[in-house]
Amino acid sequence: MTQHAPIFIVLLPLTASLLCMLFSRIKKELGPWIVMASIVGAFLSACTVLQRVIANGGKAWHYWMGGWQPPIGIEFALDPLNSVLAVLVTFISMMVALYSKPFVKEEDWLHVGGYYTLFGLLTVGLCGMIVTGDVFNLYVYLEIMSLSGYGLISLGGKKSMLAAFRYLLIGTIGASLYLLGVGYLYALTGTLNMADLAQRVVPFIGTPLFAIAVACFIIGFGIKMALFPLHGWQPDAYTFAHPGAAAFIAGCMSKAPAYALIRFMYYIFKVDSPVMHSALNVLGILGIAGILIGSIMAMAQYDFRRMLAYSSVAQIGYIAIGMAMGNMYGFIGAVLHIINHAFMKCSLFLVIGGVEHRFGEVNLYRLGGLNKKMTISTITVTLAALSMIGLPPTAGFFSKWYLMMGAYTGQQYFYIAVLVVSSLLNAIYFFRIIEQMFVQREASLTEVHPHKGKLGLPFSMALPIFVMGIGILVLGFYSVDIVTDIIKLGLPEVFLR
């Protein structure tokens, strides 16, 4: 069965999602457990793939649907980078699926089944985008990710329907631009397979049609990954999304498009042409603007979730400037920050959801005494905040370190200045949270769901928060191994010459 591990990453959660409503109708609790079991299976399949790819020295595992060879057949192409990202997405999905149970505990079977159906489909879309070797199938998975994301955001109540509708309008533009870019490439090359496309597109790299296609991909993926100034949908979407799913949406939903953009820029188009140099310069400018403006906007917020939404705009800027540097260290920093930020932001949103579940609000200035009421959550927030600032030995330090090395190697010293300023701004608004939790007088919060235990939350919520907090340290301690044994095995050809 291990020879089919690549397809199981997508097939298991897809099958469970399609059956979830039926099982939930039979017994309300059955549907969620079916979806969670399928995600565990997808996670184990992703681990199997990663282990085999590393054992083969980084050689990609090509899986052909039905035995049909590309470019005619549909292919999953798993290399060290997308294999580790598949492990990341399925692991976070597994944690958040368990975490979500108390939020839907009192709902009827229809709402419970609907929630976990959308959750499973979001996992399918994210994993499919990461592992597919076909540009049109990437569009299919992009739409699955987007549609399920719209649904999960709309379940949040209050202003969530408006936030989801705004994301729908803007996201549709992004998906349409991506599809338009695919059409241009197909017109030039006559193929949709990524590996075949990388060979056939070379003679057309200097043409106007190719430049238009590149612009379509940058804008299309830029919208999906909330790259400044294309991030307008994100603050409301993160703020008003269903609290159970917000951690998954914030942690992973912008990372799959970011990786897809890296894949196009470095593996299909290469980066050693005037057109691509111009594209990288644009990414760098947008990344710098996003880092500075996102950080400043985050400082002005009093709602914890909205602050983190603007913080994500800045963090996506880090990934953008890593891509824009055009050297090995910048590339490593960008990929490593995709992994690290997924853990950091997911951890913070898990805690926010826990605070909202227990107290019904997440005002930054009403967190006083939280260290006594929710100890595990407070520790996780502290670790995540230190990592976002970039202090060792947390994960965030190492991705910023590689970005600094990339800027130094490329003599792009203005990137170093931006990273330093951004870290100082991060320190201002994250230490504000730490001060509220540890120093300020205990806030008089009304407990919506009182919890008397030491964990401060139900076990199914406290466990993922604890695991994700530990994960931030583990990623920090093993960052050198991740870079050496995984990321460097999957470096694009341009860095191996």
What are these regions (language model features)?
Residues T2-L12, P80-F91, V135-S148, F210-I223, ...:
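Structural signature of hydrophobic alpha-helical transmembrane segments
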Residues S17-K27, M95-E107, Y150-K159, A163, ...:
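C-terminal ends of transmembrane helices
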Residues I26, G114-L121, G125-I212, I223, ...:
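Alpha-helical multi-pass transmembrane bundles of energy-transducing inner-membrane proteins
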Residues L152, V201, Y238, M265, ...:
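Interfacial segments of multi-pass membrane proteins
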Residues A163, A215-V282, A309-Y310:
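Short helix-boundary/re-entrant hairpin motifs in multi-pass inner-membrane proteins
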Residues F228, K345-V351, G410, F414-K452:
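Predominantly late transmembrane helices and immediately cytosolic-facing juxtamembrane segments
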Residues A241, M374-S377, R432-R497:
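Cytoplasmic/organellar membrane-interface segments at the starts of transmembrane helices
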